[in-house]
């Protein structure tokens, strides 16, 4: 198969040869590697050769050939944003598309059901291209194994070649993309070529309120899979009605040769609670395990059990060990139309959190994530909405450990396709009811679900943000409901299409609703509990009216709190030659047009993670309903 540039123009082509999404578990050769690191993973982070082209027509066409002369290529650091490495244009936008006012574009199939626009992005004057090259050798432990490459985050359209052979294509910027390199891998001198286009039809559904970057911005790893390997792990802990006992069901997917799987579950103190062995390949399900004296996971006591599965071959040689921490908890929407977690009414003291670092943009470190967790705990914040995309893989485990509720949002926002300068005009909204778009958005829901399905901190799946509503989003809801009965589904955009409210979202979710309007809803025999998915917009000297929302919690059981907009400013440090100091620059400070200017600064913290005075209000009022 050959790569096709026209895939950029077609919303029905969003993954080619990409491996199916799966759980986010790690695997090791033995338990000693839990501390030293897995021998089965090799990082490709660091310096890559790089070429920047302003348009697809200017790209180095055959750069992926092993004999290509790349002496005139630059060097770029991976992970990193192309724009922050000095190429292209830094641009912050809230709702419009980056090309608005310059190039006329409509999403394919929205003006005519037979309309596919050739060259929409593949021959565009504004579609910048990054071409990356990396050479690597295989470590001895990798030789003879199945070899997978994992890109944890690439904006926006990704083509991959190895040693001159086309490997695959993907689009979803914020969930991992994996491809099988085995047919073309060499022991030495491998040439990995990656081409990243800033825009494809995915741009119509990745219109989030943020700086618009491109490039390989999360980790890149080579993974070796042993002869028998657990590719997916599905953990289903279910407390009984009394919450004092429960059962555990676990299903694995084993690729390669049939294997013996030895499972052990320990409590927090390391005591073995249950163990069993199963043999097979493909789908391998363990017998239901019963638990007495159950410890529940909650924000107050985020109790996690330790699962370990050892994989043995036919000669009883240990091939790999898979550890995973999991928790028991319930999430219920009861007949009284109130949400309960572990039989207690849910109160969300939440924030919306973009991933951000003032020096590196959305390239964030473990230190950044741990600092954010500590800030949340110190200020009585008990919930995070991953606005408006899936976060880096470690974030979900950190929230499990800290007791932070998660609303795990799917990578979907099409704001510019239906709301223009504040006016509602959905004539070319996507995904909408368009039969050419549901596969792409359901795939994004599937990726979000599969990667993060085992985390007790997730109590809501979110279908995305500000994308209006239609049959395609209803299909996303149906996907989550079909695959998971242990969580609720959230979506705010159905507010604009009340005829779909019975089929989309378990909660009445609104943005920036006035307290008196919330009261009017709650006193009018509502059908769903109320949740502010965004409120208390913290721009400038804000949050002065937080008490008016907080007072609703004690008066109305169906009022379940909300998520403040937002956690951290999006701003970048730039060296000021006049003062010889690094200063924070916001939207519009990079000579970009158009821009939504300082609207990028709505955080409870400045971009350097210094808390603003408003954080004192948050700590006080959120502390009233821990």
Swiss-Prot record:
Record's keyword annotation contains Metal-binding: no
Gene3D superfamilies: Galactose-binding domain-like, Glycosidases, Immunoglobulins
Gene Ontology CC terms: beta-galactosidase complex
Feature type site, description Has an effect on thermostability: 318
Active site: 466 (proton donor), 534 (nucleophile)
Pfam entry (one): Glyco_hydro_2_N
Keywords annotated in UniProt: Glycosidase, Hydrolase, Plasmid
Catalysed transformations (reactions): Hydrolysis of terminal non-reducing beta-D-galactose residues in beta-D-galactosides
Keyword Cell wall biogenesis/degradation found: no
InterPro entries: Bact_Beta-galactosidase, Beta-gal/glucu_dom_sf, Galactose-bd-like_sf, Glyco_hydro_2, Glyco_hydro_2_AS, Glyco_hydro_2_cat, Glyco_hydro_2_CS, Glyco_hydro_2_Ig-like
Enzyme Commission number: 3.2.1.23
GO biological process: lactose catabolic process
GO molecular function: beta-galactosidase activity
Function: Component of a beta-galactosidase that displays activity with the artificial chromogenic substrate o-nitrophenyl-beta-D-galactopyranoside (ONPG).
Sequence similarity: Belongs to the glycosyl hydrolase 2 family.
Complex formation: Heterodimer of a large (LacL) and a small subunit (LacM).
Designated name of the protein: Beta-galactosidase large subunit
Species this chain originates from: Leuconostoc lactis
Taxonomic placement: Bacteria, Bacillati, Bacillota, Bacilli, Lactobacillales
Gene name for this UniProt entry: lacL
């Amino acid at each position: 198969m050959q790569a096709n540039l026209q895939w950029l123009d077609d919303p029905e082509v969003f993954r080619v040869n990409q491996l199916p999404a799966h759980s986010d578990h790690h695997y090791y050769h033995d338990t000693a590697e839990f501390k030293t690191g897995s021998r089965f993973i090799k990082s490709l982070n660091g310096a890559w050769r790089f070429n920047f082209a302003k348009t697809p027509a200017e790209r180095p066409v055959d750069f992926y050939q092993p004999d290509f002369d790349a002496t005139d290529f630059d060097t770029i650091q991976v992970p990193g944003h192309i724009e922050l490495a000095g190429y292209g244009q830094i641009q912050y936008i809230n709702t419009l598309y980056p090309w608005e006012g310059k190039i006329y574009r409509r999403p394919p199939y929205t003006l005519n059901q037979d309309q596919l626009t050739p060259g929409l992005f593949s021959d565009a004057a504004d579609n910048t291209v990054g071409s990356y090259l990396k050479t690597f050798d295989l470590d001895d432990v990798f030789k003879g194994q199945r070899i997978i490459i994992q890109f944890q985050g690439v904006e926006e359209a990704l083509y991959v070649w190895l040693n001159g052979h086309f490997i695959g294509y993907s689009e979803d910027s914020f969930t991992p993309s994996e491809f099988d390199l085995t047919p073309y891998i060499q022991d030495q001198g491998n040439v990995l070529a990656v081409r990243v286009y800033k825009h494809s039809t995915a741009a119509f559904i990745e219109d989030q309120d943020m700086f618009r970057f491109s490039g390989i911005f999360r980790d890149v790893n080579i993974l070796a899979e042993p002869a028998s390997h657990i590719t997916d792990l599905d953990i289903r802990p279910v407390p009984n009605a009394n919450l004092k006992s429960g059962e555990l069901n676990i299903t694995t997917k084993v690729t390669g040769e049939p294997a013996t799987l030895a499972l052990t579950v320990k409590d927090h103190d390391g005591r073995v609670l249950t163990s069993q062995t199963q043999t097979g390949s493909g789908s391998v399900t363990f017998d239901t395990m019963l638990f007495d004296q159950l410890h529940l996971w909650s924000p107050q006591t985020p109790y996690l059990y330790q699962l370990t599965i050892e994989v043995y071959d036919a000669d009883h040689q240990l091939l790999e060990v898979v550890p995973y921490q999991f928790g028991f908890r319930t999430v219920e929407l009861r007949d009284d139309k109130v949400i309960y977690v572990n039989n207690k009414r849910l109160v969300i003291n939440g924030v919306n959190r973009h991933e951000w670092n003032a020096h590196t943009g959305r390239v964030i470190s473990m230190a950044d994530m741990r600092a954010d967790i500590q800030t949340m705990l110190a200020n009585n914040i008990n919930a995070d909405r991953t606005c408006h995309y899936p976060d880096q893989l470690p974030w979900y485990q950190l929230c499990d450990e800290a007791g932070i509720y998660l609303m795990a949002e799917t990578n979907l926002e099409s704001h510019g396709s239906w709301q223009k300068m504040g006016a509602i005009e959905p004539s070319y909204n996507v995904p909408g009811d368009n039969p050419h778009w549901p596969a792409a958005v359901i795939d994004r829901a599937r990726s979000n679900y599969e990667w993060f399905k085992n985390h007790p901190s997730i109590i809501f799946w979110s279908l995305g943000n500000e994308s209006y509503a239609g049959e395609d989003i209803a299909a996303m809801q149906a996907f989550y409901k079909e695959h998971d009965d242990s969580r609720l589904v959230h979506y705010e955009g159905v507010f604009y299409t009340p005829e779909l409210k019975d089929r989309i979202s378990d909660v009445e979710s609104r943005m920036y609703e006035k307290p008196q309007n919330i009261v009017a809803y709650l006193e009018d025999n509502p059908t769903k509990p109320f949740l502010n998915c965004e409120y208390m917009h913290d721009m400038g000297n804000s949050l002065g009216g937080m008490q008016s929302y907080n007072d609703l919690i004690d008066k109305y059981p169906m009022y379940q709190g909300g998520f403040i907009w937002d956690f951290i400013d999006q701003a970048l440090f730039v060296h000021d030659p006049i003062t010889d100091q690094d200063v924070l620059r916001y939207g519009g400070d990079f000579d970009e047009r158009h821009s939504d200017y300082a609207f990028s600064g709505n955080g409870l913290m400045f971009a350097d993670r210094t808390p603003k005075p408003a954080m004192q209000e948050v700590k006080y009022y959120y502390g009233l309903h821990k």
